[in-house]
Amino acid sequence: MHPLNVKDWRHRVMIGLLVCLISGSIGVTAAGSVALRDTKTRQRADKALRDGDYEGAEKTYRALLAKDPHDHQARLGLSLALLKQRHLQHAYDHASRVIMAEPLSARAHALLGAAILASGDFRNSVEEFRTSLRLQDDEAIAIAGLAMVDFYENRLESSIRGLRRAVALDSKEPDYLFNLGQATARSEQYKEAADSYERFLAIAPKTDADRRDRIRGLIDFLRYLGNQASLYDLRGANNTSMTFESVDARPILKVRVNGGKEYLKFVLDTGSGMSVISEETAKKLGLRPVARGGMARAVGGGGKFEIVYGFLSSMELGDVKIESVPVYIRHFYDDRYSVDGYIGLAVISRFITSVDYGDNTFTLRRERKLKTDAQVGFGGSASPARDEKGELTTSTAGTLEIPVRTTSSGFLSGEVQIEGIEQPQNFIIDTGASITVVSEKLVEQEDLTTFVEATRMRVFGAAGVAEDVKRVLLPRVVLGPFVREQVSAAVLDMESLNETTGFTQSGILGGNFLRHFRISFDFQRGVVRLEPLGKTAKRSINGNAEVPVVE
């Protein structure tokens, strides 16, 4: 069962639309008279929504609907209140009920699209957003929704344009400013990002203290970054190749930082946007925090860890040197095999990055910059990628390109098919995790309990240690055309993590899946390339990952 039941609803809406068009009944409804009688109640609900009292707003909108179930304005308000609380199925249901009665409601289609997008269904969400804009071309929710699709699929210029327009249309909606801050920060426009977050704090509800603390710390960090001449400056060679040690199916590279001669051990971590360094190593290097504030969401322990920002003058990977590297500083819980840090996507995103689990080699290859927003699309609908000279680029012969997205929190996400589940699921592609993960929610919704094994696990995560973790043996896991059978996966609560991903992640593809391939990450074009290994592939140390790490 898909989390949002799109197919049956769409059939009913088409019938409803046909009936309405034939009868000529689209127009003024009974909701108008109800709105006049209940003006004060409606104003109270709208104020609660603006003030961040989403439960109070929900209660008041439900009271209006109890008086008149045909009050579509109240039902749309209820849908938005539920969406803000991430009650996605209920938000979807109420928006679809309005569309059944008023098929030409632009706001209803926009809210439906927003709920579908948050659930991770991009194709149907785009259809709803476009329908909304055909009905009303200044519907801010739909404009912002399409902009976020662009953001997740790494079309940053288009995303920023759309979010700026949404802010101009509805300057009182804090989420648009927050999302604009995210998009401009990712495109390294740090001043505009900090300004957007400042404006967000000025109008956002005061109810979420942790989120506000997190953003204040982020603003301080962005101001600091804005004072730097530039970030992630590339020095040295354009290409490098180096061997890595594989521990628990995680690639561990020898890295030098801040011009030091000593090699440090860093895990290649495509499950992190920014690089991370351990508190202990930061202390050895004399690395001090440049900003801090709020709690980050992650797997393990209580699902959160304190956000502390640092800054490295340089990081050397083989013959490649990257200068001015922002990092997180945090405690590492796994004491079985000590590492100094994790290399995040921002460090390697200017290269085609290859990980060969067969012969344990890591390669960086710098290519010409593509024209902005040139991506390989999901479903193959995008234009071919071209470099800055307008020339077509080509992929490596004999490999298959699989489109990937980037979450709000900077994780790499791909569509995965699991046997027994009809709809594809969004999974984080994480070289820093030793084992695959499925969310507790997915196990419950899709009745995967029949695959639960008797043994329990202990899992180390960024937010702490999770004890007595269930494990499922998935019969088939499919990424693109590639299939792995009998994939062991830890069952973890991912709800805290999904608070900041933007669209729902149902699991993590970890090392016990990825180690069977040669993988190339082409970040400019938004694809990964997979090539299955032969039978001669080397096995990693502790390849069964009996004590897994999910960082």
Enumerate the language-model features and the residues they cover.
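Active-site charged/polar residues at nucleotide-handling catalytic sites that mediate phosphoryl
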Residues: G52
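Bacterial N-terminal signal peptides
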Residues: M14-S25
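Compositionally biased, intrinsically disordered low-complexity regions used as flexible
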Residues: M1, G24-G32
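N-terminal secretory signal peptides that target proteins for export/translocation
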Residues: M1-R10
